[in-house]
Amino acid sequence: MNKTALITGASGGIGKSISETLAARGYNLLLHYNTNQNAAAELAEKLSQMFGVNAEILQADLSAQDGADKLTSSIVQPIDAIVLNSGRSHFGLITDVDNATVQEMVQLHVASPYMLTRNLLPGMIRNKSGAIVAVSSIWGETGASCEVLYSMAKGAQHSFVKGLAKELAPSGIRVNAVAPGAVDTNMMNQFTPAEKEEIADEIPIGRLARPQEIADATAFLLSEKASYITGQILSVNGGWHC
């Protein structure tokens, strides 16, 4: 029987790659999106046709207080894996960030993943199995000037992962995170081509990460090959700030 995975932010660059990778491994998929319905629907249709899996799309704004409850209320089937991938960066001085932006970023990266996971855990605990992976960021480990809000949110994700892993280990559920460095997705569009080159030059491997490389790390942590790994932050950053 195929396992079922929920992937938040499935229509974005990393989310799409994770979805494709898990579909290739036989997972049925619940693909969450916020605004990009067309991209999510096209992805679901493509994966169903290519891999013969069930792929359903679900809409929710996880930056809203009721977003997580709205999303999980529409899920009726047992969940075997959760990929907490929704997120967005924010660039700017701390003194220029208003309260509404702070609340939205904390809701999106911290509160909604907490609530979503809490709502789905009873079934996983009954089954005494499951795996959860949060897609966080290198800045959750090191922090970044002019991305203090984003760094704070991602650091909170890491604490969530470590605490939850200890709480759920007796129930046979593993919890980990993948912490990417600079990844070649639309999130990097805030930088000019020249700035992207400068960032790549700082990375020992000499280039930005590909979304597929983040997807492969995520799939590994969900797999039985990682059966004794929990509470860990797997840095996928090409040696940048390691």
From Swiss-Prot:
This enzyme's EC code(s): 1.-.-.-
Q: Which InterPro entries match?
A: NAD(P)-bd_dom_sf (IPR036291), SDR (IPR050259), SDR_fam (IPR002347)
Instruction: Write out the catalytic residues in the record.
Output: 150
Name the domain of life. Answer: Bacteria
Q: CDD domains, per this entry?
A: SDR_c (cd05233)
The GO terms describing molecular function are: oxidoreductase activity, acting on the CH-OH group of donors, NAD or NADP as acceptor
Could you tell me the keywords of this UniProt record? Oxidoreductase
Class of enzymatic activity (EC top level): oxidoreductase
Q: Where does NADP(+) bind?
A: 8-15
Record-level GO BP terms: fatty acid elongation
Protein residues bound to substrate: 137
| A Pfam family | adh_short_C2
The family classification in the record reads: Belongs to the short-chain dehydrogenases/reductases (SDR) family.
Q: Which NCBIfam families match?
A: EF_P_mod_YmfI
* Protein name as annotated: Uncharacterized oxidoreductase YmfI
Please tell me the species this chain comes from.
Bacillus subtilis (strain 168)
Gene name, per UniProt, is ymfI
